[in-house]
């Protein structure tokens, strides 16, 4: 018999969507929230912030998704190969007939998985250079403000405050936060960013150094300080930071990124602050050494000065010779002043003797005669001035005549030069060659001037413009008719000068 249902059944058919959503409701109502343990694979961090992954064991696998809003709240970062325990809600994806788990929380399945994840994260941050020694900032030698990020209760904060109070007088700012659990990494990161955001000179003093402290605990207890976001926040800060998380044997990710690592919170307080008593003792010792050094230097300079002064002459000896020269010069000066006064008095008497009325009258007469002579010469020059003006008025006309005469002379000379050049060219022996004639030279090199100079069979040389040719005379020649000389060209007469204007040449 056939197992197929009868075709005449009256049961209403489901649509594909109705069946898919019915299965979805059944699955969600039956299971709700579940906890799964398995290994992560196919982890994909989408650009929109969601994370898609697969949770598998040795026999089966189930798809999972972490929505963007839940990614930051996960206890661990989803990575391929990590064994985890997830909590979420089972649902279906009707468009693909698949079921999946929507993950709300995630935690590592064991210490080994946590340490493996930590090693991968350490390698990643080290490759980015976050652990490089050159990034480490030096701690201030004498901080005025120390910022402490830790739990407000417990022995850690008491040990830090007590140790700082005993060593160094400074202000301590405590930023309280939880140091264990899922919220610890976010609160510690917020505290570090808050301290770095304080501006110098504001109402709240900006710390010179930060201490992140927590007591000892298990790997799970200290896991918040292995958070990647916390490590990057420490690296981005500008205030030097000391990490004091756990005991000396405990190592967290923040220890590699911080500027200094302290084995205990008490040691962190000692790293951050100097000892006031030691500084005072050091300053006192330096002051004593400086005073002794100064006194010794002054004594050495005084001894050297005394030794050098022994070789110097006495001041009176230095001035004795100059004083003697001064006394001699002052004695000579008195006598010289007396002689100078006598000479000038005699000169004054001679000058006053010449200033008589007769001498002044003679000088006046001479000056008057010279003045009269100058007046006569001035009158004569005034009478001749019109003639000089007329002569100067004729100068432009004379210059024009001189210029015209020079132009005519230049033109005549140019015409003569042109005629001479034409004559030179006509007398040039090479000129007939340019007109197609040839020069006939006999065997001895003489020029044949007529046919009678040549005999039959004689070898001659014909010179043309383009070159020479040898030839032999054949036949008897007769006298050539005498050439008629060309009539000479009439010589142009020079143009007559304009009427009323003379020729300077």
UniProtKB/Swiss-Prot annotation:
Q: Localized where?
A: Cytoplasm
Q: Into which family does the record put it?
A: Belongs to the XseA family.
- Cite the record's Pro residues compositional bias ranges: 480-497
Q: Name one GO cellular component term.
A: exodeoxyribonuclease VII complex
Q: Which reaction does it catalyse?
A: Exonucleolytic cleavage in either 5'- to 3'- or 3'- to 5'-direction to yield nucleoside 5'-phosphates
Q: How does it assemble?
A: Heterooligomer composed of large and small subunits.
Molecular function GO terms recorded: exodeoxyribonuclease VII activity; nucleic acid binding
Name used for this protein in its record: Exodeoxyribonuclease 7 large subunit
Source species of the chain: Caulobacter vibrioides (strain NA1000 / CB15N)
Q: Which gene encodes it?
A: xseA
Its EC number(s): 3.1.11.6
Task: Output the GO biological process annotations, alphabetical, semicolon-separated.
Answer: DNA catabolic process
Going by the UniProt record, its keywords in alphabetical order are: Cytoplasm, Exonuclease, Hydrolase, Nuclease
Q: What does this protein do?
A: Bidirectionally degrades single-stranded DNA into large acid-insoluble oligonucleotides, which are then degraded further into small acid-soluble oligonucleotides.
Q: Lineage of this protein's species?
A: Bacteria, Pseudomonadati, Pseudomonadota, Alphaproteobacteria, Caulobacterales
Main location class: cytoplasm
